[in-house]
């Protein structure tokens, strides 16, 4: 079901997060990700993501879109091109119309008449490269089982031991930290940015529940996943 696909927009992204991402060697991109995990489960999600500046997707800007594919034995391949704007949109629509027309022309005369009432005659003849078909349904994995890295920005009271308390909460939930950065203040509140190693989403949010109960924590204005 479409409702089972996790979707998150870019409204929470602030100038502060963009600046921290640059300092840490990342850019922020809105990605739609589908990946096979253990067994036959599929993880499908849409959300803003910190992408390493050296990654091919980091250089996709403006009206351009890209599809990045990784598999065996293919390795990594990226398809890149215009994905927005008048020209790109007109090209995509024209391609779909021409594909439909070409298939209607190639249908037997009897099927042409029936296709007016039964769209299956048209759909079954569509170019498989331009149509959307599947052989079997796939089980979507629960979001709690997703394994990824996380970026989190905390606003805390400026007092000793806050970073240590954060580390304790993360450690108790099995979350390993890759980096902890404290460089600025916002209205007398200290700003702490944390990037984790790979961790399940469930474990990460358990740690956040503990952290929210700390007296020194004012708020958690930003949470982002890291590619």
Report residues per predicted region.
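Low-complexity, glycine/alanine/valine/leucine- and proline-rich hydrophobic stretches
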Residues: 44-72, 83-87, 168-171, 175-186
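An anion-binding loop in the catalytic cleft
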Residues: 69-80, 94
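Short, surface-exposed loop/turn motifs that are enriched in glycine and acidic residues
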Residues: 7, 79-86, 156
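A conserved regulatory-domain signal marking ACT and ACT-like small-molecule sensing domains
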Residues: 97-227
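A generic structural motif
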Residues: 33-34, 70-72, 155
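Substrate-binding/catalytic subdomain of NAD(P)-dependent oxidoreductase enzymes
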Residues: 1-59, 64-66, 85
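Short, charged, low-complexity patches
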Residues: 86-94
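Short, well-ordered beta-strand elements
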Residues: 77-82, 193-195
